[in-house]
Amino acid sequence: MSETVKFTCQRVPREIGAFTGFAELNEYRRKLRELGMIGVDANGIGFGNLSIRDGATSRFYITGSGTGGTADLIPSDYARVVAYDFAKNWLRCEGPTVASSESLTHAAVYESEPTVFSVIHGHDVKLWAALLEEEATATPKGVEYGTPEIAYAVRNLFKVTDMERRKILQWPGMKEGSWHLGEMREKRLGRYSDRRSEAKCSVAAMLYVTPV
């Protein structure tokens, strides 16, 4: 998957300080990098991204574009998405970096389900194949990443499937890709157990699995 940003981004340069959930999200990201679900491919293109809702709003913090190869992120490696328009394929973000190419898909999740507090998009061919075999909730084939179509598809899946309950989404058109959605529980991130390795940390997330 290319990390090329396809949307029009209006970036407002602004310092990003440590936000609520920053440490927990980074810890989960480190574990996913160890598993190879986030990183850089043979062509030097980064893959995988994480985000966390900004309080009870539809705004969110998301890893910046091209950060897959960075071992440990600091607050300035994140962008705060404050507005978006699916039809115009546009978003506004704050911070020193451009928001991840998957930002509009994350926005579709937060807009569709208020209980989701974090979103993780990771790449793992084994998990992707397992989800494909069990016919997990999936986006339509042929829908490209970073487009209004994928955002609309995700919103529709919340309406017509049990994704709200399962909190995992597979992307058939992107081998190894999946998404995990998390809930906010008592103002804290819950615990999520990675299905492949059983590695645990304090972040609960919706996983969106796509292949590399």
Each model region followed by its residue ranges:
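Glycine-rich flexible loops
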Residues: 1-212
